[in-house]
């Protein structure tokens, strides 16, 4: 199943032009986003120009699969000539002089950029309540959060503002919002996609990801944005069609690992959805095997030591001098630094910078940062050992359905929202979230994790499931143009 391919057929047949399709999406955003607040910058003029170019390419018969397909980008991917804010006052007026590799690859495929999406400031958050531009609402219930940090990316696709969107995943920031908004989203293996031009949070964790309604669409998009990049030394080449190569193959004989201890304390409706999903995978020929996943609370602690440390280093560049917000009342250099950073950063960002500087202090380094890095290595080894027995590990994508705004203002409570997603980031492994059912009439998601560069196994597993048992058609009816 592929929404992209359905749009491709409409464009190629002449049923709709790229300009007409773009105008439909732009009109829907302008009409409906006031209540959702998913879009920071609407690129109407640029989008229509790109759509005109796409129509010319289609008329010449030189189109790719993605020519003329609209897309929205999380506002931490640099877009030449268009504001890139990272949802922060610090970058409120920053216009990137170049394109990120991710956005450039989309442009090169002929995609149409509709706009830039709201997010938690500098990708720090799990609710999308930490944005200089205001909180984002979940299209399923406007009083609830869409998840974070890529909440705008999830809400926009769920609302039907674009067929696909880009996001980033540092600790679950595409997978948890996908669960809350009824979408499929994937964080590929660390290094599969370039981080060049992506505003940094924690560089050894950050990875670009994709939101869509179907795993096939996510795979198509990941093929488009992945590959080698000379500007990112951590980016490795993956072969052409890496993510789509096995979509048509059945999954008979695949072994799914599950740690029952991670399921037993979940709400009853989510447990029921998990059980039904695993039963359906067994009907498709997969085998279920019990495994023991490393302690998730230790993973959470490890994550919230290392990532603030990396964030403190990365965000040191915002000093009010080179670019970004500058306090106009500072009387000397020291005051300029202090006032610009105090005013320019939001509370959650400042909290994580302070944690990061604390754990990196010479008196605390060995007790916190060094031990966390050692534990990261141990946990990665433990997870990789599990893959000697199984092809994928199944976990929930989130411990609950979307919760109400303001329910988790306590930082620790909010951090626990990522407890099931963080292991994939700690280990750099690929993981995909997909809808598995409903709890209290809201979507909930499951998640598969695989060993490094077995991304194709994840897209294969979920595509075969969605072709046979998925609930995406019901969800998509809420959003279809």
From Swiss-Prot:
Listed Gene3D superfamilies: Amidase signature (AS) domain (3.90.1300.10)
Active site: 74 (charge relay system), 149 (charge relay system), 173 (acyl-ester intermediate)
E.C. number(s) listed in UniProt: 6.3.5.7
GO terms (BP aspect): translation
Protein name (record): Glutamyl-tRNA(Gln) amidotransferase subunit A
Name of the gene encoding the protein in the UniProt record: gatA
Function: Allows the formation of correctly charged Gln-tRNA(Gln) through the transamidation of misacylated Glu-tRNA(Gln) in organisms which lack glutaminyl-tRNA synthetase. The reaction takes place in the presence of glutamine and ATP through an activated gamma-phospho-Glu-tRNA(Gln).
InterPro entries according to UniProt: Amidase, Amidase_CS, Amidase_dom, AS_sf, GatA
Family under the similarity heading: Belongs to the amidase family. GatA subfamily.
GO cellular component, one term: glutamyl-tRNA(Gln) amidotransferase complex
Cited PANTHER family: GLUTAMYL-TRNA(GLN) AMIDOTRANSFERASE SUBUNIT A, TRANSAMIDASE
Pfam family, any one: Amidase
PROSITE patterns named among the record's database cross-references: AMIDASES
TM segment ranges: none
Known catalytic reactions: L-glutamyl-tRNA(Gln) + L-glutamine + ATP + H2O = L-glutaminyl-tRNA(Gln) + L-glutamate + ADP + phosphate + H(+)
Subunit structure: Heterotrimer of A, B and C subunits.
